[in-house]
Amino acid sequence: MADEKENCVRMTRAATKRKASMEAAIDKERINKKRVVLGELPNLSNIKKSRKATTKQKKKSVSIPTIETLNSDIDTRSDDPQMCGPYVTSIFEYLRQLEVKSRPLVDYIEKIQKDVTSNMRGVLVDWLVEVAEEYKLLSDTLYLAVSYIDRFLSLKTVNKQRLQLLGVTSMLIASKYEEITPPNVDDFCYITDNTYTKQEIVKMEADILLALQFELGNPTSNTFLRRFTRVAQEDFEMSHLQMEFLCSYLSELSMLDYQSVKFLPSTVAASAVFLARFIIRPKQHPWNVMLEEYTRYKAGDLKECVAMIHDLYLSRKCGALEAIREKYKQHKFKCVATMPVSPELPLTVFEDVNI
């Protein structure tokens, strides 16, 4: 009995020491984090951008898709249980309905906002990319945060002094929804150089949740991009990582432009895939029957959205917003932001495909 008590004491003391050591390490890491003020972002040169790509690609043979292969869903053929092969058709049917239900107003800046401009929104999104890199957050967290911002601004008027508060609080909510170990409120106060208090962020969190009616799982372009990218790789004998990173880059670029709000997330995802295939193989038609079947978009349906992303890629729009561009110039993302592209999109690429 005495031995058991002694062992218990030893275990308790050991556990206490381990806990104290972990807390000290966390405090040290928090102290080392750089405070980031929204207005200072263009001058930041040493902000951390070290989210390691953990996606592992499984090698598989490449075959040219035929009409017959359309009957065999690529998700059903996948050996990844997370793809939910048996239910994928129903899941994506639901997501297509949900994206329409949860979309923001396409002209909320003109109709709802009095103090916020499209340029302010772009600067905010660019800053949130820096925040996501600083805390090594998932891309889904960033997409959700931006969607919460657009949805909230479609419902409530916000003055420009509180726009950053809306952005950082949206990132907090998205982190809680997506991340295993999300940053806490103090972290988000710190990253804004204590521009806002903990109480202000908590109050804004409640306001956002009530305005969105606690509906936080809305699909984003990243939701559809995963599946569309898999289809796009079926007839490409090239690095799958390069295709994935380029599609992700184009999709993230779209968030900078307020005009992207008028497109459904699935439209943005399909347009990113379309333009990525054009960039990689400019002499080949970027669309095919298989992509048309899975995305439910014809090439002509994507013309306006593809043109918008193409302008963003060439820095014709939002050229001063560099966070996403610098992020994808890194070798860990295959430097996809530096890939050359034609300054003009031939009209022939938007013709319907018959084979």
Curated annotation (Swiss-Prot):
The keyword Cell division applies. One of its GO terms (biological process) is cell division. Keywords: Cell cycle, Cell division, Cyclin. One of its GO terms (molecular function) is cyclin-dependent protein serine/threonine kinase regulator activity. InterPro entries: Cyclin, Cyclin-like_dom, Cyclin-like_sf, Cyclin_A/B-like, Cyclin_C-dom, Cyclin_N, Cyclins_cyclin-box. It comes from the Eukaryota. Pfam families: Cyclin_C (PF02984), Cyclin_N (PF00134). SUPFAM superfamilies: Cyclin-like. Belongs to the cyclin family. Cyclin AB subfamily. This is Putative cyclin-A3-1. The gene is CYCA3-1.
